Amino acid sequence: MQYTLKQISEHLNAKVINEPSGEVIITGLNYAEQAKENDLTLIDKQEHIKLWQNSKAAAAIVSKKISKELAQVNDKPLIVVNNADLAMAKILELFSVPYPEQNGIHEKAVIDPTAKIGKNVSIGPGAYIGKNVEIGDNTIIYANVCIYNDAKVGTNCIIWPSVTIRDRTIIDHFCRLYSNCSIGSDGFGYRPSEDGRTIVRIPHIGNVVIGSFVDIGSNTCINNAKYGSTIIGDYTKIDNLVQIGHNVIIGKGCMICGQAGISGSVTIGDGVIIAGNAGIKDHTNIGSDARIGGKAGVMWDVPAGESHMGYPAYKDSELAKQWIAIRKLPETMKKLKAIAKSLNIDL
């Protein structure tokens, strides 16, 4: 797979500076420090300029704000764009390896006769499609996927091997579910018995509702609602190994990073980012455009637009004061002991 520099710049509708007289062939994409002679790289930050100086890459996609400075480093061609990261995403699509070819319904797929299968749907070997399931047009279902009774999957979805979609789940259009994720398992609902000697299981009779253009990473679990629905909004992206409890409501355009845990009945607004390994206490509310730092432990509501981090999580500006105070604590104790000694007081 290869493209000329001209084809790439035209695909981005972008200007080239240090444009060469001859044709430049691009055969791959890589980081500046790892790039080979026919690779295209990305330079989008001031601190990456030094990497470009020593890079073997044939050309770079660069942010407009640093393009003039970068053009003086050497005479290699630069494709200038407003947002280099988003531009590179478009080029990554050009170089993406096609999905494994799968046409039609495999003879070893098990499909209940009551299921409704749309046009141009592909279903791989070992897949199970239960009673009254609906699959939209152009959806690809790979090997060993299980979709249980009364579930609905929209159009143009891609469901990778060994995904489990439980009863009554509703998934809208253009979603991607990666291998081994589990959608609609019972929530962790248990209560001590009246005598306190055993644990009583609470049935979960609701469902999971997933909007359009949602990505769900490998080994992520989204639990069924006790009643009502666990809801994931349009365009939300969920990493691998994320746990989402029963009756959680997540808004549109959120990003949830790996190993985050969201307890039952949490409500999350639109555009929220939750970093890796963060934990959210049950029945809390996270406002739209909030940011939750890595390994944060959120114990109470987070207002819209605020950044919270640490354990327990506080607003970033408040937590910074705590960190400064802790760093000063040894010196403060030293001074306090000196004062106590001068006053003949034991600490």
Swiss-Prot record:
Pfam families: Hexapep, LpxD. It is an enzyme of class 2 (transferase). Belongs to the transferase hexapeptide repeat family. LpxD subfamily. Keywords: Acyltransferase, Lipid A biosynthesis, Lipid biosynthesis, Lipid metabolism, Repeat, Transferase. The active site is at H246. PANTHER family: UDP-3-O-ACYLGLUCOSAMINE N-ACYLTRANSFERASE, UDP-3-O-ACYLGLUCOSAMINE N-ACYLTRANSFERASE 1, MITOCHONDRIAL-RELATED. It comes from Francisella tularensis subsp. holarctica (strain LVS). One of its GO terms (cellular component) is membrane. It catalyses: a UDP-3-O-[(3R)-3-hydroxyacyl]-alpha-D-glucosamine + a (3R)-hydroxyacyl-[ACP] = a UDP-2-N,3-O-bis[(3R)-3-hydroxyacyl]-alpha-D-glucosamine + holo-[ACP] + H(+). Catalyzes the N-acylation of UDP-3-O-acylglucosamine using 3-hydroxyacyl-ACP as the acyl donor. Is involved in the biosynthesis of lipid A, a phosphorylated glycolipid that anchors the lipopolysaccharide to the outer membrane of the cell. Homotrimer. InterPro entries: Hexapep, Hexapep_transf_CS, LpxD, Trimer_LpxA-like_sf, UDP_GlcNAc_AcTrfase_non-rep. One of its GO terms (biological process) is lipid A biosynthetic process. The keyword Acyltransferase applies. This is UDP-3-O-acylglucosamine N-acyltransferase 1. The gene is lpxD1. Pathway: Bacterial outer membrane biogenesis; LPS lipid A biosynthesis. Its EC number is 2.3.1.191. GO terms for molecular function: N-acyltransferase activity.
